[in-house]
């Protein structure tokens, strides 16, 4: 699948609005890559029979797939972007349009986020997204992330993207600290805490996990 593999990183996002394996054999495809007024532009359009990847669809009628990504980078490494992905099949569209950002406030403080509006089979619970502020230094990592998936997101995105679950509100946080010892035969000591919890949109608890870890790395020579 060279057509999709080359430049696949241009459409990579945490919530996968575009997943090339949703598209089977293609008779043709067009790509566009370049810059427009300081914005990086990536786009593709192609055609395929969706029954190649979805056994519930009858073989015979092709769908048209369109994907576009615009990204603007700043001098400090931050970026803002827009990504859209759509499948036109029969007389209907399925897909999503999303805003993405990676912001570096200081050398150690940053934030990533994604906000998505979906369309397709479902007309309620069509929003998804996450926000993740983080602190990263040579010895410490800390982040808090909140994710939201409406109850109709999976049905709308998955004809052209990939979401494993929806109807959820998720909170997770991670703290990890590394201490350099370099004596008593110990090279370094690392401690970490990871917490994850998610509920349905109605507030019903579906899963939670609390994981604590301690790691010792010894010197090669005592």
Mark where each language-model region is.
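Residues that define the transmembrane beta-barrel architecture of outer-membrane proteins
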Residues: 24-28, 35, 61-66, 93-97, ...
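Extracellular loop and loop/strand-boundary signature of outer-membrane beta-barrel proteins
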Residues: 16-17, 48, 52-57, 85-87, ...
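Outer-membrane beta-barrel translocator/receptor signature
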Residues: 25-26, 37-41, 52-54, 60-66, ...
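Secondary-structure transition into beta-strands, especially the periplasmic turns and strand N-termini
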Residues: 36-40, 78, 109, 137-140, ...
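Surface-exposed extracellular loop regions of Gram-negative outer-membrane beta-barrel proteins
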Residues: 65-119, 181, 185-195
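Conserved structural-core and active-site-/substrate-pathway-adjacent residues in large, well-folded domains
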Residues: 32, 43, 70, 98-101, ...
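Residues that cap or anchor secondary-structure elements
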Residues: 1-34, 40-43
């Amino acid at each position: 699948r060279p057509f999709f593999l080359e430049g696949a990183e241009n459409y990579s996002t945490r919530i996968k609005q575009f997943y090339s394996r949703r598209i089977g054999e293609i008779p043709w495809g067009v790509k566009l890559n370049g810059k427009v007024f300081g914005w990086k532009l990536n786009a593709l359009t192609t055609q395929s029979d969706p029954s190649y990847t979805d056994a519930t669809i009858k073989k015979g009628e092709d769908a048209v797939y369109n994907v576009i990504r615009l990204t603007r980078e700043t001098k400090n490494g931050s970026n803002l972007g827009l990504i859209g992905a759509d499948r036109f099949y029969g007389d209907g569209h399925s897909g999503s349009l999303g805003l993405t950002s990676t912001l570096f406030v200081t050398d150690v403080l940053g934030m990533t986020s994604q906000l998505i509006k979906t369309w397709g089979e479902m007309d309620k619970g069509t929003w998804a997204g996450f926000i993740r502020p983080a602190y990263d230094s040579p010895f410490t990592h800390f982040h808090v992330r909140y994710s939201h998936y409406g109850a109709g997101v999976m049905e709308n995105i998955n004809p052209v993207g990939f979401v494993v679950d929806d109807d959820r509100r998720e909170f997770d946080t991670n703290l990890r600290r590394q201490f350099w010892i370099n004596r008593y035969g110990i090279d370094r000591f690392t401690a970490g805490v990871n917490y994850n919890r998610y509920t349905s949109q109605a507030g019903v608890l579906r899963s939670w996990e609390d994981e604590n870890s301690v790691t010792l790395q010894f010197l090669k020579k005592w």
